[in-house]
Amino acid sequence: MILGDRDLKYYLEKGWIVISPLTQDTIRENGVDLRVGGEIARFKKTDEIYEDGKDPRSFYEIEKGDEFIIYPNEHVLLVTEEYVKLPNDVMAFVNLRSSFARLGLFVPPTIVDAGFEGQLTIEVLGSAFPVKIKRGTRFLHLIFARTLTPVENPYHGKYQGQQGVTLPKFKFR
């Protein structure tokens, strides 16, 4: 079941879903808009090969600021301004707001698991031309879905509680 605006307001009022900071204008008909945060990670251009065990920080440049330019075909990691906390019976789909998609930006399919909490780090692919984005701009849209029953294994992974743009944390198997 997708949560509509009335449901979302109720869940937020009860503290079952937490979005902080939250402004009422970001609650939409069937979801909540999230804003661009103050940090971005750019992939460094390098011939170095990433392999298991290497520190991923050597492959990124992290910038802090109030505005960022996403260059043509660039792949960046962007953090949301908001901290999100979901209960064990709600998950969310992350979508790019259509105005940014119409500029050619792209966000791959992304899910926020039931039980997750933290700022969201989202992959963004650049357009055919540079696009400037500003901190605080409504950029993403979260659509919340309630599961029929609480999940048996809520999210407790390595990205739980993340703050700021978060680089990959995994090992190849």
UniProtKB/Swiss-Prot annotation:
InterPro entries: dCTP_deaminase, dUTPase-like_sf, dUTPase_trimeric. DCTP binds at R97, S98, S99, F100, A101, R102, D113, Y155, Q162. The keyword Flavoprotein does not apply. GO terms for molecular function: dCTP deaminase activity; nucleotide binding. GO terms for biological process: dUMP biosynthetic process; dUTP biosynthetic process. The keyword rRNA-binding does not apply. The active site is at E123. Signal peptide: none annotated. It is an enzyme of class 3 (hydrolase). Keywords: Hydrolase, Nucleotide metabolism, Nucleotide-binding. Its EC number is 3.5.4.13. It catalyses: dCTP + H2O + H(+) = dUTP + NH4(+). Pathway: Pyrimidine metabolism; dUMP biosynthesis; dUMP from dCTP (dUTP route): step 1/2. Catalyzes the deamination of dCTP to dUTP. Homotrimer. Belongs to the dCTP deaminase family. This is dCTP deaminase. It comes from Acidianus ambivalens. The gene is dcd.
